[in-house]
């Protein structure tokens, strides 16, 4: 029997790894589009600044073809390079397009009509067409310029420092658009605004050179539609990761933004590893987890085998990203989400309520985290030299705070699982943590609920009047405090199915226990309760939100 189990384990692991081709193998060639990329061989800041504005206009032009936008994007991201000719060779690695370099000497005065070099493969008609495209901005672009300030485009730029400040300010906005171009491109840009504010505070982004939101959206759309551009950006991210502490401003900036791009689309996988395997708590020994633990082991081996590009599977549209979808390990994913909702306050904004979420194992995770969060790791305690009395004191301290019995704090006891706004204390300001991203990243892979921006329905007061005052957010952890292990939905009457497996729903609904005979409702303590004492038709309050901070 043991040989069969070992064979099954090897089979599961090899199933994830055997279909990979050799590294660097050339795929079957398909038809390629011709992409013209403009090259400036001079460090003249005036010419480069005109090329920067020219590329922005081509990207935003309403009649530009996809190949025009791709060439403009590659040119735009190559402008800080001292040798554009060599830097653009990164795009030659893409099997998706044929790159044609066009050397440009400058622009005709007062226009965006290109002055090609004698070696440039540009006809007079193409030069005239590019000039028309640069002037053909859509009506959604205000003041006839992609910038928020109308006078920015016509300002003189005769110093390298001026050009670099303007170029980096534009490029950092384009890189921020890359962060969500594949996972949340259609969602409100709340996280992008926070990142813009961060880089303005750091001095990397000058507010005067901000692009209009419509221009930012068009840049994001062009990047999303072009695999060539995203492959080029992946090479740039890998170059930035290899830089040492002494790096130039541009690659230091790219390396910083790359932390938000790495492992996008894999949030569920890494959260499962963090809260299920990382905690090393006893429920991992459940027999139901055995097969899924083998699955996770094979996925970790697959991730390591993919090498450096494993961080950018979503950006590269790699099919291997489907292997990491949580639908392949639903039980241990449900357990990990239960643990995470107790340990990490940011998990409340993560849409973990997928169709395959198992209520039993989610609740096992919740109860395990509540009971085990005060336990002491004996190995760490031995390294610190803690005595048995000190270990007991630490455990009692955590248990007391977890139960809301903290003493000596103004305003009464504090529940660490209630948001600060409910405790009437100043809300904490969290930094932008790149490791914890939105829940939208797995929506395409497993059919889970997409990422949503937070709104609240107005509460209904007694007498049928709607109360539009600010309502306190329902705490999903507090609502689950006394929830028993509820039965499967399939065993419940039809009129009660919709009231099961809802996490953070109506105020008392998740605390109720139903019997099969349809008797009166009881709460978790066996007391008969009135679920909605004021109005039986009371609306639910939805808790949804952003997953960035």
Swiss-Prot record:
Record: residues binding RNA: 180, 195, 260, 350, 354
Superkingdom, taxonomy of origin: Viruses
Q: Where in the cell is it found?
A: Virion; Host cytoplasm
Task: Give me the ranges of the annotated region Ncore.
Answer: 1-404
Task: Cite a single GO MF annotation.
Answer: structural molecule activity
Primary residence: virion
Query: Where would you find the membrane-spanning parts of this chain?
Result: none
Instruction: Alphabetically list the UniProt keywords.
Output: Capsid protein, Helical capsid protein, Host cytoplasm, Phosphoprotein, Ribonucleoprotein, RNA-binding, Viral nucleoprotein, Virion
Q: Which Pfam families match?
A: Paramyxo_ncap
**Biased composition, class Polar residues, residue ranges:** 531-542
Q: In this chain, where does the modification Phosphoserine occur? A: 439
GO CC field:
helical viral capsid; host cell cytoplasm; ribonucleoprotein complex; viral nucleocapsid
Q: Which InterPro entries match?
A: Paramyx_ncap (IPR002021)
Cite the record's note on assembly.
Answer: Homomultimer; forms the nucleocapsid. Binds to the viral genomic RNA. N0 interacts with the phosphoprotein (via N-terminus); this interaction allows P to chaperon N0 to avoid N polymerization before encapsidation. Interacts (via N-terminus) as N-RNA template with the phosphoprotein (via C-terminus); this interaction positions the polymerase on the template.
Function according to Swiss-Prot or TrEMBL? Forms the helical nucleocapsid (NC) with 12.71 N subunits per helical turn and a rise of 5.3 Angstrom per N subunit, protecting the genome from nucleases. The encapsidated genomic RNA serves as template for transcription and replication; encapsidation by N is coupled to RNA synthesis. Forms the encapsidation complex with the phosphoprotein protein P. Before encapsidation, the newly synthesized free N protein, so-called N0, is chaperoned by P.
What family does this chain come from, according to its entry? Belongs to the paramyxoviruses nucleocapsid family.
| Notes concerning its domains | Ncore is globular and carries the regions required for self-assembly and RNA-binding. Ntail is an intrinsically disordered monomeric domain in the C-terminus.
Protein name per Swiss-Prot or TrEMBL: Nucleoprotein
Gene this chain is encoded by: N
